[in-house]
Every structure is written in C-alpha cells, then in structure tokens.
Amino acid sequence: HATIRRQRQMCIRDSNKVKPNTYKVIKDHPRLIIPFYDTTGKIFAFQGRAFGKEQPKYLTIKLDENKQKVYGLDKVNFQQPIYITEGPIDSLFIDNCLAAGGADLFLKNKIPNENITYIFDNEPRNKEIVKRMYKVIEQDFNVVIWPEDLQLKDVNDMIMSGLTKLELQDIISNNTYSKLSALTKLKYWKKIKEV
C-alpha cells in the first residue's frame, strides 16, 4: 500500500508535469482529481472533473495510451456480476462497478456478457445514449432501463436526492433487461424517433 500512497502523492503533486506539452492549457477551473488504477493498483490515468458547468466537464491524462479508460479495475471482482456506469462518481455508489466508455470491448472474453449490466444515464431524449443502449443489447449485455416515473438524470443525482444505496440497488435490479425484453422496453422508454 506504500506504493499506492506514493503514486497518489505523485498524482496530486505532479499532475501538470506528467506529459509536458501534450495538452493545451485551458482556462483553469477547480476540478476533482480522480485517479484510475489498473488491476495491480498502479495508476495509468487520472481525470479532472469540473464542479460546475465548465467545459470540458472531464479532462483526462493517460499515462499509458494502450490502456482503455476504465475506472474501478483495482476494486472489481471479475468472478462476480459487474455493473458498468458512464462516470466514475456514479460507480462509487454501486457494488462491483466499473465506469467506462467502450468497456464492452475491454471486457470481451474476460467474463460472459450476461454477467455484465450497463447503467446509462436516465436521458431518454439523448440520441447518443439510446444508440449506445441498442449497441450493448445487440451484444447480449444486460442494460438498466430506468422507470418512467424516475426523473433524475444519473446515479449520483439519485443518491443526492436521498435514495439510499440499497434503494438504488433495488431500482437497478428491478429494471435490468436483456435481449428481446430490453429491446421492447427501450422502444417505449426512448423519447426520440430514430437512432
């Protein structure tokens, strides 16, 4: 754990020196620094998340360009069912959860698709999210399709509104679909005509 502690200190102390002249300097905003660890506990990337409406919302620096940007690899048990959220903060509220874009490619052949459940943001009018939901369903992954009466945008908003972790897990469990049932549910959930 001393190695991890040293890596965390390096992340905080030298975040602006890791890859000099690689990233354009933009207007500075306060950001939460989120370290990404691999399965051995070694940092391979870190991400700065804006607190307000600043754009870009996320700035990511990868120390190893060959690794996919997947958060939570150091904590997940690949022998158990895995959840995948869009963002690292959402993943903190769900047991055995990763956060990633394109994680389906990363996890191929590691565990069966039916043991992976994607949890996208609750945005039925977002064409990109709906398109990604169709893609993971076609690849035989499970997907959470939020109930229509739930008006909160993402897992973090749900927790901030007062839902407990257990209540959130119940909602996720009761609204996880796959294959034909997922396609049918998604057809009625989405609020856009074409994808």
Question: Where do the PLM segments sit?
Answer:
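Single conserved hydrophobic/aromatic residue that forms the stacking wall/gate
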Residues: H1-I12
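A short acidic-Thr-Gly-centered motif at the start of a beta-strand
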Residues: K24-I26, K69-F78
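A short, hydrophobic, proline-anchored segment that marks a local hinge/packing element in signaling
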Residues: R31-Y37
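A short, polar/charged loop-to-alpha-helix boundary motif
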Residues: G52-L63
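Flexible, glycine/threonine-enriched loop-and-boundary segments that flank and lead into catalytic domains
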Residues: K17-K19
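TOPRIM fold recognition
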Residues: Y37-T39, F44, P56, Q79-I82, ...
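Short coil/loop residues immediately preceding or within conserved phosphate-binding loops
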Residues: Q7, R31, Q79
